[in-house]
Structure formats: C-alpha cells, structure tokens
Design a protein with these regions (language model features):
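N-terminal accessory/interface modules of nucleic-acid-binding and processing proteins
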Residues: 1-204
Length: 206
C-alpha cells in the first residue's frame, strides 16, 4: 500500500509539473477539470486528468452501487485519489468513471450538463440578468465577459497566497504589480478556456 501511495504521489507531482510548464498541456488539463469543477478540488482533478483524461463523471463504488444502481465493469481500472486520514496520514481512495460502469435494474444515468439549442437562449438571458451584462453578442462573447467579471471579483482573494509563495520561482524576479497582472490575466484566460470548453464552443489551444 505504501508503495502504491508513493507511485500515485509521484504521478501527482509529475502531472503538476507538466501542466504548469506547457500551455498546451495546461489547456488539455482545463478541458478535463472543467467537467469536475464542482465535485473535486485541484489535486483530485490533476489525478483524474493523469489517469483518465476523458472521464466525464466520477464517483466511488458505493455511490455507483447504492445511489445510481450501476455496477463497475469487471477489469476496469479505478482512478486513485490521495486522501488524508487520522493525524494527517495519507491514504488512497478510488473512484470510477461512468464509462467504466453499467446499469442494473433501476439503474440511473448521471446528469451531465450540456449546452443545446433549446437551452442556449435561456442560458444567455440568465447570464445577462445575473451579471448585469448588456449587449447582443453571441454566447461565446457572453461567457468570455462573464468569466472576466468573476475573475475580477475574486482574484484578489488568492493573490496574497501567490505573493507569499513566489520565492524560488520565476515570479521572484517580478514586483508585486507585475505578479498581480500576470496572475489576473492567466486566471482570466484559464477560466474562459474552461467555461468555453465545457460549453463545447470551439476554441483553439495557444
């Protein structure tokens, strides 16, 4: 078990290095992470991306069996996630993607949000009303502006942590103002990419 945990820990570290050193790899990670923004944190998203980047809905076996009435397919590979137990001791937990399950009697399919022609206009109207966005741009423009507003409102909560942790990184060479500008622009572009990816609007990798 200790050896398995070490392997997964190393996988997480290597994946983190890869996605933060390559714009293309970061975009591919965002495409996966966008599908799990609500249920899993960044560390989990990294490991899901590393082990099954095409996953769409993940849950542990009890959830699939008891709540969804779906059995995990024989021979399928679980996705290992790192958890902390009593006293902070790490251990591995396992989840399975819906593609590796099948329904039994009374089985349910997970609800996966998707943009359709039927809900496109209601989505646009809701975004305009919620975020006070004027104009008659298309959905892509509306999502871009919404993401920019959200980032502008929230990036300041995370900036102090970044400034504190910048030692021994390339950010160390920048003053506070330029770190802030770089962080805000990177965060905005990442959120926009993830939102557009989830909405299946065509986007090009940088």
């Amino acid at each position: 078990m200790a050896q398995k945990w070490q392997t997964i820990s190393e996988l997480a570290a290597e994946t983190s290095r890869k996605v933060t050193h390559s714009p293309e790899e970061w975009c591919r990670f965002l495409t996966t992470a966008a599908r799990f923004y609500k249920a899993y944190d960044f560390d989990d998203q990294l490991l899901i991306y590393a082990q099954k980047p095409n996953a769409t809905a993940c849950a542990d076996m009890p959830t699939w069996n008891n709540k969804m009435r779906r059995w995990v397919n024989a021979g399928s590979t679980a996705i290992a996630l790192i958890r902390k137990g009593y006293g902070g001791k790490p251990y591995l937990d396992y989840v399975h993607d819906v593609a590796d399950t099948h329904p039994v009697r009374g089985g349910k399919d997970p609800w996966l949000w998707k943009l359709t022609e039927e809900n496109r206009e209601p989505v646009m109207e809701r975004l305009r009303d919620t975020f006070g966005i004027d104009g008659s741009g298309d959905l892509g423009d509306l999502l871009m502006e919404t993401a920019e507003k959200l980032v502008q409102e929230s990036y300041g909560e995370y900036l102090p942590d970044l400034l504190y942790e910048r030692e021994d990184s390339f950010l160390e060479e920048l003053d506070d103002f330029n770190v802030e500008v770089l962080f805000r622009n990177t965060l905005r572009a990442s959120v926009q990419y993830a939102v557009l990816s989830l909405s299946l609007i065509h986007i090009s990798e940088p």
